[in-house]
Amino acid sequence: MSSKGKFYMTTAIAYTSGKPHIGNTYEIVLADAIARFRRQEGYDVYFQTGTDEHGQKIQEKAEKAGITPKEYVDNVAGEVKRIWDLMNTSYDNFVRTTDEDHEKQVKKIFKKLYDKGDIYKGSYEGLYCTPCESFWTESQLVDGKCPDCGREVQPAKEEAYFFKMSKYADKLINYINEHPEFIQPVSRKNEMMNNFLLPGLQDLCVSRTSFSWGIPVDFDPKHVVYVWLDALTNYITKIGYDADGNSSDLFNKNWPADLHLIGKDIIRFHTIYWPIFLMALDLPLPKQVFGHPWLLQGGEKMSKSKGNVIYADDMADLFGVDATRYFVLHEMPFENDGIITWDLVIERYNSDLANILGNLVNRTISMSNKYFDGVVKSTGVTEEVDADLKAVVTSARDKVAEKMKNLRVADAITEVFNLFRRCNKYIDETAPWVLAKDEAAKDRLAEVLYNLVESITIGACLLKSFLPETADRILAQLNAGMREYDDLDKFGLYENGNKVTDKPEILFARLDAKEIMPKIDAVREAQKAEFEAEQKALGGLPETTEETGEAIDIEAKPEIEYDDFMKMQFQVGEIISCEAVPKSKKLLCSQVKIGSQVKQIVSGIRKYYTPEEMVGKKVMVLVNLKPAKLAGVLSEGMLLCAEDAEGNLALMTPEKAMPSGAEIC
């Protein structure tokens, strides 16, 4: 197959503050599926990932651990790479921002921008969020806290260098308007335009003097380069960009990037800071930045203190690498956050991998051996049902390609499994076990099994980008090779008279939840114990972490009649999207799925939950409350909360997994 041209793609480089959990790992698996499919299509792919290793947060963690920052990041970077390799990701380059060649170019880039007049020296007095490595103004805070992570900010005053962001703001606005594909999904573009660009950009602080773990400004070494200027430039430095004009052939071939794949929480840095830095360097902008959603544990962010963190290596130990890849790829929608729970992982494993796929392959090979000693041969004895199967199979490639073109990877893998579902239906329609009882139907039986083997072969080739090891195992059992992309819309290329394996292996053995849940509980307890040991070592955790909470009494309200109570309708709802209400510091506006309907509900809980934390939660809803407007926004119900003596609120959620729409009685 001739090359369709270059395709340079990157992930965000993982911040080396700790071991990446499954939510972090999702990004590299998503990127790998895209890279593999682009290669399959015929693109010359260069896929880069790596680690972001500088900053105040890392320096503080290293000091607490009693080691140097370099020792600290060496350990974490090694762990990140181990997990990326465990997940069978096909990156071409793993970068580290402590690499000498990167540090050399960052210094040259900083000097070039300074000489150009885009960076100038001044002093900074403002508010700084250490975990996010971000400066904020008072007006940008949400309830006095960092708008990105909700943590406390600290006053900071120091001499600093600044970048003239406002100089390029209009140019960037015009670029975004003229290139609607640049920021995806569209909701991310709207957020950047309305919240940052249109209100006006302030100059950006691009150096620090209050810590030392960073790349020094070579002409003023008491300053270190702002972590985001350092980190973002890896996309060009690590493919050979040279600020002096001596860039490598690799850079000249691959820049601009075709895709930056990042988490939605860092979209601002990649769609405002990064393109403006590139404009200042007179470099073309990346073709697309995709801000993917988050993978949440049961609707909540993962936290070791809660024992709810899920790590990729734990999942791989329990379910296998490809099962882990399948889950994170299948469960992540295009725009909204995905939900992961151990129960859901087991359900998907059994229903999709063990039943739909594994059982199909095993049955087909077993019947081929039972009825024809494993020989697969087309006899030409066809029926109408064959044409429908072939239509589904030969159209699958283009359906998958269309989904992948638009980065709808979950939909793409669903299309592949739709092919396998159609094969299972074909078995039910043709009933090979019935045909086997009739000697006159022997040729028809052979044709049915040939059609199944051919269909599964094509399906396995399409599965290769998503579950590479499983695809190889299927093809090996069918005694078939990987096909060229251009042949995946053709039916009948399986070699006539070929022989499948006489010893089919089980791809995915069905799981018994009763047997595996104790293993999962052990993982949870180990996480909690590890967290408590870490915190006690740092002096940050009391002897017990159990929440006690004293009982409180509240003023009694008048009794009501039972009939009055029965007028109220309570149901379980699932929050599918949430955003802050403009011009309000207290209100959140949620779209809540209740059965088959979606209601918009405004709640005064912004102090206690971020919009991101809300998405995916199962909540208790008063659904028949008369609609009313709060701060000018229509609210069609009420979310039930509990309130303690200090007025703190907590959402009421079902104790056990309940479907959206379940009645509360």
List each language-model region with its residue ranges.
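Secondary-structure transition/capping motifs at alpha-helix termini
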Residues: M1-S3, R36-D44, K64-A65, P69, ...
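Structured secondary-structure scaffolds
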Residues: S2-T49, D101-Q105, C149, P155-K370, ...
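N-terminal catalytic cores of NTP/NDP-binding nucleotidyl/phosphoryl-transfer enzymes
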Residues: S2-V76, V95-F110, D115, C132, ...
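A glycine-rich helix N-cap at a beta->alpha junction
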Residues: G78-D92
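Cys/His-rich short segments
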Residues: K116-A169, I173
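Helix-rich, typically C-terminal accessory recognition domains appended to large enzymatic cores
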Residues: K121, D343-V381, V392-V500, L622
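Intrinsic disorder at enzyme termini
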Residues: I474-D564
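Phosphate-backbone binding interfaces of nucleic-acid-interacting proteins
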Residues: P542-C665
